[in-house]
């Protein structure tokens, strides 16, 4: 398998193609495009930019299917670190991981079938159906996960050469890399331990209702025990609102808060934070976690 440069699809024999080029629909501008062939699959990497920001679209294509995940630009370095972990660790040291980025959660799950080992990467968010790509480990040290990692490294490096207009630096602490069961630590990042109540992983995310349209793209997600809470700014024919969605397993419920009540809501939440701060000091969220292996 080889890596190449260009714009469009992959060439025979596993070539990866690089180039800046068109192809972005609407207001999206394509900055970098690469293609990688792993076994019978083609993977397309497209770094794009629009007025809402920059993102990396990774698509997996086989003869019968195509699936896509969308990675925020702030998550490219985390994907690179995670693939480094899977490439460089011994097989018995590999664990499934979970990465939280803004309003999205990405799951990295190790599996094996008759063709060999693979890494399943799934994207889940409150505004998009769950999507999954499956990356074979490869039959030699420079194939599969390693080739995928190398392309992520090239895109990460190239991304730094493009200056985004009105670029806003992510707030400190928005992405953290930790393990919550000890094993599978990824070198080069903090090893802060989250509370034990965060060990269980919920994996089903429902899509929002059709009546809640006009989402602005300003979203956040937090974790508490076995639940996730999604905060999404949006608007409809009644005006602007903040939708707060609670997701636990397959259960999902939402409340819609008009912006006119947001300040009062903030004051009430602040009141309860103040009177309970002695109880919640030291509780921190985890953006990348090790997932307990299934019982066999």
Curated annotation (Swiss-Prot):
Keyword Transcription regulation: yes
Lineage top rank: taxon: Eukaryota
Compartments, record wording: Nucleus
InterPro entries reported in the protein's UniProt record: PUR-bd_fam
Chain's role: Transcription factor that specifically binds the purine-rich double-stranded telomeric repeated sequence 5'-AAACCCTAA-3' found in promoter telo boxes.
GO cellular component: cytoplasm; nucleus; peroxisome
PANTHER family to which the protein is assigned, alphabetical: PUR-TRANSCRIPTIONAL ACTIVATOR (PTHR12611), PURINE-RICH BINDING PROTEIN-ALPHA, ISOFORM B (PTHR12611:SF0)
Classification lineage: Eukaryota, Viridiplantae, Streptophyta, Embryophyta, Tracheophyta
Subunit structure: Homodimer. Interacts with TCP20.
Pfam families on file: PurA (PF04845)
Modified residues (N-acetylmethionine): 1
Ranges that cross the membrane: none
Gene name per UniProt: PURA1
Protein name: Transcription factor Pur-alpha 1
Single GO MF annotation: purine-rich negative regulatory element binding
Family indicated by similarity: Belongs to the PUR DNA-binding protein family.
């Amino acid at each position: 398998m080889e890596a190449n440069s260009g714009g469009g699809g992959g060439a025979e024999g596993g070539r990866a193609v690089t180039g800046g080029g068109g192809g972005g629909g609407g207001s999206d501008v394509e900055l970098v495009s690469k293609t990688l062939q792993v076994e019978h699959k083609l993977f397309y990497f497209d770094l794009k930019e629009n007025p809402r920001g920059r993102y990396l679209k990774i698509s997996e294509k086989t003869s019968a299917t195509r699936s896509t995940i969308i990675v925020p630009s702030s998550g490219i370095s985390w994907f690179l670190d995670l693939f480094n972990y899977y490439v460089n660790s011994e097989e018995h040291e590999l664990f499934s991981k979970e990465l939280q980025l803004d309003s999205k959660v990405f799951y990295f799950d190790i599996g094996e079938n008759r063709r060999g080992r693979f890494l399943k990467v799934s994207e889940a968010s409150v505004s998009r159906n769950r999507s999954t790509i499956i990356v074979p480990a490869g039959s030699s040290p420079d194939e599969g996960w390693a080739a995928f990692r190398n392309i992520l490294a090239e895109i990460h490096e190239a991304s730094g050469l493009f200056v985004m207009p009105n670029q806003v630096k992510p707030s400190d602490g928005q992405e953290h890399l930790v393990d919550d069961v000890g094993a599978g630590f990824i070198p080069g990042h903090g090893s802060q331990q989250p509370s034990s109540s965060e060990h269980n992983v919920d994996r089903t995310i429902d899509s929002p209702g059709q009546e809640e349209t006009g989402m602005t793209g300003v979203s956040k997600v937090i974790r508490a025990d076995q639940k996730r809470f999604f905060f999404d700014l949006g608007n409809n024919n009644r005006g602007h609102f903040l939708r707060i969605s609670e997701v636990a397993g397959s259960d999902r419920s939402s409340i819609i808060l008009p912006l006119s009540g947001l300040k009062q809501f903030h004051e009430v939440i602040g009141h309860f934070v103040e009177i309970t701060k002695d109880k919640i000091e030291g509780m921190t969220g985890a953006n990348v976690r090790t997932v307990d292996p299934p019982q066999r």
